[in-house]
Amino acid sequence: MLILTKVNIYMLIIVLWLYGHNFIMSESQCPMINDDSFTLKRKYQIDSAESTIKMDKKRIKFQNRAKMVKEINQTIRVAQTHYETLKLGYIKFKRMIRTTTLEDIAPSIPNNQKTYKLFSDISAIGKASQNPSKMVYALLLYMFPNLFGDDHRFIRYRMHPMSKIKHKIFSPFKLNLIRILVEERFYNNECRSNKWRIIGTQVDKMLIAESDKYTIDARYRLRPIYRIKGKSEEDTLFIKQMVEQCVTSQELVEKVLKILFRDLFKSGEYKAYRYDDDVENGFIGLDTLKLNIVHDIVEPCMPVRRPVAKILCKEMVNKYFENPLHIIGKNLQECIDFVSE
């Protein structure tokens, strides 16, 4: 008679379990089995093609987001090297003007008038500042005036965003200059990385509080990227790539105008131009071919019917030529008043 030890008992249990498992598996493969047992399986196989398309869309969306975050991180790393180089250059520049004047060295500086005005303006903001966080906020207003326009696109910007998908980051290269100015004004030119991080967090809180007062108006909203379609696949891809960089339709219009009419903005001749000829007011009409390109890019991205989109697009073009907000220095007094409060 077989004596069942503990080991034998355990082995017997395992054998019986395996036998039962194999029996169940073999029954599940039997063609006579009731179809009801496959209800769940059939449920998820009915729309297999549709499921594949959805998975592909999710995969592409994830890849695009991953690419975006990678590019942002790469820009931040490059900006760190830029900060160190810019700070050395700034300190040398300040030493230079101790023994001479800006007027004397201006001829050797590219775009000397713009450089002179920039340095003069940011110096005035710095001298009036009593608080590092308010100084940073005022310099953001000064250096990014287009973000604080009627479309309120600043709502989507942060210095240190919690989510790099939900919020955009201000240009790290301009932030480097702001950081250098703050370190000069309050920290005797010492590099204060931790302090800068704290200041950035405080400024983000100020941006959040200001953002709560506004919303992006419907006329400035953009279609979801997957709903944008151009005249061809190539056009669609190009338009989507431009839209990925924008928060509002006004920003998209500005980007296209700065590309197509670069010379007018660079020379300052833009002041004499509008969408249509206006002889009474002395305005010259813009190139029709280039305006058609603006419409072809912008209209598919607006969540309204094409006739309405065309009218809104024309309004935004005229608005930008009346007051191109990318040109800094127009709001100097506003910035000084802000830091003086």
UniProtKB/Swiss-Prot annotation:
Keyword Metal-binding tagged: no
Q: For this UniProt entry, what is the primary localization, expressed as one broad class?
A: host cell
Q: Give the protein's function.
A: Major early protein present in virus factories. The presence of BEN domains suggests a possible role in organization of viral DNA during replication or transcription. Plays an essential role in the inhibition of the cGAS-dependent type I IFN induction in host dendritic cells. Mechanistically, abolishes cGAMP production by triggering host CGAS degradation via a proteasome-dependent mechanism.
Any idea where the BEN domain is? 112-222, 233-328
Provide the topology term for how it sits in the membrane: Single-pass membrane protein
BP term (GO), one: symbiont-mediated suppression of host innate immune response
Name a GO molecular-function annotation: DNA binding
Q: Where is the protein found, in the record's own terms?
A: Host cytoplasm; Host nucleus; Membrane
Q: Which Pfam families match?
A: BEN
**Single GO cellular component annotation?**
host cell cytoplasm
Which named protein is this?
A: Protein OPG067
Transmembrane region positions? 7-25
Quaternary structure (record): Interacts with host CGAS; this interaction inhibits CGAS-mediated type I interferon response.
Family the entry assigns: Belongs to the orthopoxvirus OPG067 family.
PROSITE patterns annotated for this entry? BEN
Keywords, ordered alphabetically: Early protein, Host cytoplasm, Host nucleus, Host-virus interaction, Inhibition of host innate immune response by virus, Inhibition of host RLR pathway by virus, Membrane, Repeat, Transmembrane, Transmembrane helix, Viral immunoevasion
Q: Which InterPro entries match?
A: BEN_domain (IPR018379), Poxvirus_E5R (IPR004334)
- What is the induction comment? Expressed in the early phase of the viral replicative cycle.
